[in-house]
Amino acid sequence: MKKNTDSEMDQRLGYKFLVPDPKAGVFYRPLHFQYVSYSNFILHRLHEILTVKRPLLSFKNNTERIMIEISNVKVTPPDYSPIIASIKGKSYDALATFTVNIFKEVMTKEGISITKISSYEGKDSHLIKIPLLIGYGNKNPLDTAKYLVPNVIGGVFINKQSVEKVGINLVEKITTWPKFRVVKPNSFTFSFSSVSPPNVLPTRYRHYKISLDISQLEALNISSTKTFITVNIVLLSQYLSRVSLEFIRRSLSYDMPPEVVYLVNAIIDSAKRITESITDFNIDTYINDLVEAEHIKQKSQLTINEFKYEMLHNFLPHMNYTPDQLKGFYMISLLRKFLYCIYHTSRYPDRDSMVCHRILTYGKYFETLAHDELENYIGNIRNDIMNNHKNRGTYAVNIHVLTTPGLNHAFSSLLSGKFKKSDGSYRTHPHYSWMQNISIPRSVGFYPDQVKISKMFSVRKYHPSQYLYFCSSDVPERGPQVGLVSQLSVLSSITNILTSEYLDLEKKICEYIRSYYKDDISYFETGFPITIENALVASLNPNMICDFVTDFRRRKRMGFFGNLEVGITLVRDHMNEIRINIGAGRLVRPFLVVDNGELMMDACPELESRLDDMTFSDIQKEFPHVIEMVDIEQFTFSNVCESVQKFRMMSKDERKQYDLCDFPAEFRDGYVASSLVGINHNSGPRAILGCAQAKQAISCLSSDIRNKIDNGIHLMYPERPIVISKALETSKIAANCFGQHVTIALMSYKGINQEDGIIIKKQFIQRGGLDIVTAKKHQVEIPLENFNNKERDRSNAYSKLESNGLVRLNAFLESGDAIARNISSRTLEDDFARDNQISFDVPEKYTDMYKSRVERVQVELTDKVKVRVLTMKERRPILGDKFTTRTSQKGTVAYVADETELPYDENGITPDVIINSTSIFSRKTISMLIEVILTAAYSAKPYNNKGENRPVCFPSSNETSIDTYMQFAKQCYEHSNPKLSDEELSDKIFCEKILYDPETDKPYASKVFFGPIYYLRLRHLTQDKATVRCRGKKTKLIRQANEGRKRGGGIKFGEMERDCLIAHGAANTITEVLKDSEEDYQDVYVCENCGDIAAQIKGINTCLRCSKLNLSPLLTKIDTTHVSKVFLTQMNARGVKVKLDFERRPPSFYKPLDKVDLKPSFLV
């Protein structure tokens, strides 16, 4: 292909981010942020959370205290690898142990005396078992010396049944921007949350609400349930900041539109009226009176001074160690936003914007659960001490309370899909696609209750804040998850930071801010507030904001702060704020830097020559001003040019308006969308459908398929795609394969391949084309006495079992075969019976339609015998199986044709698959034709000019014209065969061939599009869905067929099916289907007097209603279905009388018989 030029530099820089970067510790880019998140938790954060020393109870004015101390936290990795865990059928867990000491502190004149109450040195191997994240190459964060398995990308947990678990990331409920809401006309609220920094444990949360009603401006209050007083926010700001009301008026009015200034004046005047209405008003006295009233209202046990200190000291926990004056100025900045948002709501980030949210990654899940369960654990110890003191008069703790921290249950629930009593966080990962291991951990979803309160989800729209950071194609197109789960783009990741790094970074930023002249960072009246994680630290001179932000960004890129993912956002538009974000959970991605109208990539001419030998971290160190990591908030409030090409077409003045420039369009797709080809050449819906189908494609075998007793579908003879994108290659999806190359022909074939029908060649199937193997888990639990029952049983279902009661290895199971022995015996109460033992055969049987070979058998002996069997089955394509291309051209096998029935070219080659040609025009999938053309061109010239095999790069989204690809194909054919005529060259480029009719051996009149393409087999298999049943299990209550194919259920024959048969006059068939079955047959006696169903008492049928009236009605026997009787009984139980009545008329088909005179005729 052509040599890289300067215009492709942006693309090459984007590729550098995708490839591994060992110098920065990045070995697998797609899931690196998840590995770091979990590693931070288990190596650092877990120790911080569990290391505790705090009072449990206090007595006698804090002179006596019961203390708890948790120390010696140790985390031990497992001794075995994930493969051994699968073989043993065990989970892959790390063990956490700690020591608990509970003692009593008494303050005396001599000092503090300590008396030991209880202690526990946790050495139990089951104290805390933490599911261990398996990283790339089977590595884990505790033992990095584990061997590398290149095709194992990791990102999963293994639970106790050796089943892989993988989960999505959840959007955190707490927003970083206050939430504005219109309660009713002229009534508004502004609610925000304050969370303590990560170094403050336990984490403190406070939620505040500012309310404003235009008709009652005096009631512009801030409140928080049980944690703060309800007070006018203007007066609170004055109390905290110690400034005048005129100062607050000028601060709120500065750089505001006239309508907002008018409202500000009205609010300040209303606050003045409050002060004037109180004689000798004093702001301290006013606040103290409110605190005292709240103290009485809550009936607090604390003294008034302690209560006031707790309330005001814990006000705004995220500014815990900040002076009250800065808290007051922070409240004024919030009020500015609130008043501006009332008039210009559309300019303020709404609650659905990703700007306002952080993302919970794997490490954050475990951190949150560990924090919550530790508080429960300490609370249980406190309650146990109080109960023992109350009942026995001693301070003691039961050992059971000390040894059950409760974390194991929480972590187990997390892997079962429950995170803090909500669902949607984790799910079992089916092993049919490698892409699921990448796409699910890179997905971002919402809490279920977030969906209910959100305006966005009423229409499920793609929020503008998700642009560039999320893939616009890989979203569910139907079902309940539409718009709720989004896929990160290939350049996007989620930030992680250690507590120590957080504190160091915060300190460095504060030192940098304070290096400015004191007066320039003290413009609290008319300046731009500077916040670090929403905590106000300074207020900058408005004339210096541009220089400050530019210098900060340059220092950040040069590594001055030691963190390249710091976000700095200049919020203008009258809200006037500089926001610096350093916390975890932010979405970040790289952008090209524009400085003073110049693209910095162009200002480094030596970069191009050195780029091939550099990693992404090298570029950041040696050319720091070329690329900047930008979080989603900074991106939203920056001017970003769409592409380098557009930027270079602008004038110099226009260029100066931009801060950043984006990479090419292919980097806006996610990893699943990157597996497609030429999205931009097709119609829009094909991209969404293509992503859904690509995730359903069956991929190659995992490294230890025989050791995992788990369900899975695997491609037996996978092939690496020839036409790929860089993201597909670097993520190892291409190397792990998810399809095969087949030869297709676009044509109609005898009218068989209509719509989505495809024709597939029989010999192609026999040679292993798109052949798969199905691994299936069968698990049963059997009572121990039933399993050990040695009674002889003549059931044919036991023919595949060995003497130990388990199915034989390598046995071929058919439908109805037992998996393990399960014989239940009963003893008859008959002394005269010779053999009073009766055995019942109740095994769980194999129910699949196809035979399977037993690969592994695993048994666990507890109170029950748990038998787990892994079966394997090779499954070739059959009628009804589904296939697709990477352009969403899904097809279903309509006919399996012999080679002799198919058309052939001049070389005798027949197509493997025939696809309906009209599908290209109706679905507008031009890129499918381009893929065939490029794959065929590769076959003509598979090596580059250096003699190296090279795939063809055809990104999912690209700005390359189709003519460029045609020119590439032309060069390949000219190089391999320079003597081709123009017509022959054109036919080869466009893959047009003359095919011959197999019946007449004459050529078709028109040329046929004929060439190779990468074809995918989907997990939708006919034998997994087909249901065939004549007789079988029925439910006990209504005696109708079970529901569900797995339980041997039948297809429902309902009212519509009945009506169809009625239309054809098939009365006997209806009777047979609906009633004539020995299980469903029911004789019922009906009272002709009242219509009740008769009851059977001591063998005699009696109408209860009539017998109480001393009536002797006629009982008529009717033939009905059992479910009808159940329905009538249930209706009667609900107080509804259904009367069965009989028609009083002669038979329809007979007339009364003529009278016959039996007198002898001779007597007449």
Curated annotation (Swiss-Prot):
Belongs to the RNA polymerase beta chain family. SUPFAM superfamilies: beta and beta-prime subunits of DNA dependent RNA-polymerase (SSF64484). Keywords: DNA-directed RNA polymerase, Metal-binding, Nucleotidyltransferase, Transcription, Transferase, Virion. Gene3D superfamilies: 2.40.50.150, 3.90.1100.10, DNA-directed RNA polymerase, subunit 2, domain 6, RNA polymerase alpha subunit dimerisation domain. The DNA-dependent RNA polymerase used for intermediate and late genes expression consists of eight subunits 147 kDa, 133 kDa, 35 kDa, 30 kDa, 22 kDa, 19 kDa, 18 kDa and 7 kDa totalling more than 500 kDa in mass. The same holoenzyme, with the addition of the transcription-specificity factor RAP94, is used for early gene expression. Its EC number is 2.7.7.6. It holds the Pfam family RNA_pol_Rpb2_7. It comes from Vaccinia virus (strain Tian Tan) (VACV). Coiled coil: none annotated. GO terms for molecular function: DNA binding; DNA-directed RNA polymerase activity; metal ion binding; ribonucleoside binding. It is found in: Virion. GO terms for cellular component: DNA-directed RNA polymerase complex; virion component. It is an enzyme of class 2 (transferase). It comes from the Viruses. The keyword Transferase applies. It catalyses: RNA(n) + a ribonucleoside 5'-triphosphate = RNA(n+1) + diphosphate. Part of the DNA-dependent RNA polymerase which catalyzes the transcription of viral DNA into RNA using the four ribonucleoside triphosphates as substrates. Responsible for the transcription of early, intermediate and late genes. DNA-dependent RNA polymerase associates with the early transcription factor (ETF), itself composed of D6 and A7, thereby allowing the early genes transcription. Late transcription, and probably also intermediate transcription, require newly synthesized RNA polymerase. GO terms for biological process: DNA-templated transcription. This is DNA-directed RNA polymerase 133 kDa polypeptide.
